[in-house]
Amino acid sequence: MQPELLLFDIGNTSIKIGLAHERQVVTSYTLRTDAGQTADDLGLKLATLLGHAGVTPQSLRACVASSVVPGFDPLLREAVARYVDCPLYRVGADLSVPLENRYERPAEVGADRLVGAYAARRLYPEFPGLLVVDFGTAVTIDCVNGNAYMGGLIFPGPRTALSALSREAAKLPRVNLDVRADEPTPGRSTATSIQHGLVFGFACMVEGLAQRLKRQLPGPARVLGTGGFAASIARVSPVFDHVLPALLLEGLRRLYYEERTAF
C-alpha cells in the first residue's frame, strides 16, 4: 500500500517524521527542531524526504502533527501548505485524544504524552494498567488505567543531564552514552565513570519508579519504552516489556483513522 499520511512528532530537540497508511507506519526520519529556519527550509527538507521514500505530495491525504513547541507550529503550517498541499491536523487543536484526562488542568498535558498513552492503550487493550516511558529532552513516565490517562512523572533526560554536567563542571567532558557492559563497574577513567553513572543510573531510576507506579495500577501492568534512549536502557535492564521506537507515530496514525469521520 502507498503511504497516504505524513506524520510529525515535534519535540524540543528533534522532529520524528513518519509515512503511514491504514495498516502501519511504513518508514520514519528524524530532523533537528530548528524554529529559526524558514518555511522554505523545512519544506525543501520535506520534499527531499518524500522523494527518498518514493512518495509524491499528491498521493498524501493528510498531515498529522503532535507538537510541544508552539513556536514551531506556524512554520509547519506554512511549509505543509507550500510543499505538501494537504490538510494539516494538529493534536489538541484539530484532533482530540479519546482518553479520559485526569490531569488537574487537562490543557497542561503535552500532546506527545497523550498520544503515547493513547497508542499504548490501543496496542495493548488486554492490559488495564500501562506505563509509557518516553526518553527525550525530558523523560516522561505516563500512567494509563483502563481508558483514563492518570498523569505521570517528568525528569531530565540522559542527554540533558549530560549537557548540564559538562556545562556546570569544568573538568567533566561530554562523552557518548554507548555502554556495552551488562553491569556497572567502577570507572577507571572519567569518561567510563560518566557513561556508567548515567546509563545505569537512569536504568535503576526507571526500574524503581516503574515498580512503585505499577503498585498503583491494576495488574499485571505493562511497561513500554519509547524515545531515542529506550533501546540503550533495554540493553542493561529488563524494565521494559516492549520497546516501541515509533510509538508516537503509531498513535498519530491510529488517531487520524479513528477520528477521521469527524473531518
From Swiss-Prot:
The UniProt record gives the binding positions of substrate as: 103, 110-113, 190
Report the co-factor binding details: A monovalent cation. Ammonium or potassium.
Where, by residue number, does ATP bind? Answer: 9-16, 137
**Reactions the enzyme catalyzes:** (R)-pantothenate + ATP = (R)-4'-phosphopantothenate + ADP + H(+)
Task: Output the Pfam families linked to this UniProt entry.
Answer: Pan_kinase
Q: Does the keyword ATP-binding apply?
A: yes
Q: Which Gene3D superfamilies match?
A: 3.30.420.40
Subcellular localization(s) per the UniProt record: Cytoplasm
Keywords, sorted A to Z: ATP-binding, Coenzyme A biosynthesis, Cytoplasm, Kinase, Metal-binding, Nucleotide-binding, Potassium, Transferase
| InterPro entries in UniProt | ATPase_NBD, Type_III_PanK
Where are the catalytic residues?
112 (proton acceptor)
Q: According to the UniProt record, which cysteines are disulfide-bonded?
A: none
UniProt KW Transferase keyword? yes
BP GO annotations: coenzyme A biosynthetic process
- Give the EC number(s) under which this enzyme is classified: 2.7.1.33
- Main location group: cytoplasm
> According to the lineage, what is the superkingdom?
Bacteria
Pathway it acts in? Cofactor biosynthesis; coenzyme A biosynthesis; CoA from (R)-pantothenate: step 1/5
Family statement drawn from the similarity comment of this UniProt entry: Belongs to the type III pantothenate kinase family.
Which NCBIfam families is this protein grouped with? baf (TIGR00671), PRK13321.1 (NF009855)
- Task performed by this protein: Catalyzes the phosphorylation of pantothenate (Pan), the first step in CoA biosynthesis.
Could you give the subunit structure recorded for this chain? Homodimer.
The protein's name in its UniProt record: Type III pantothenate kinase
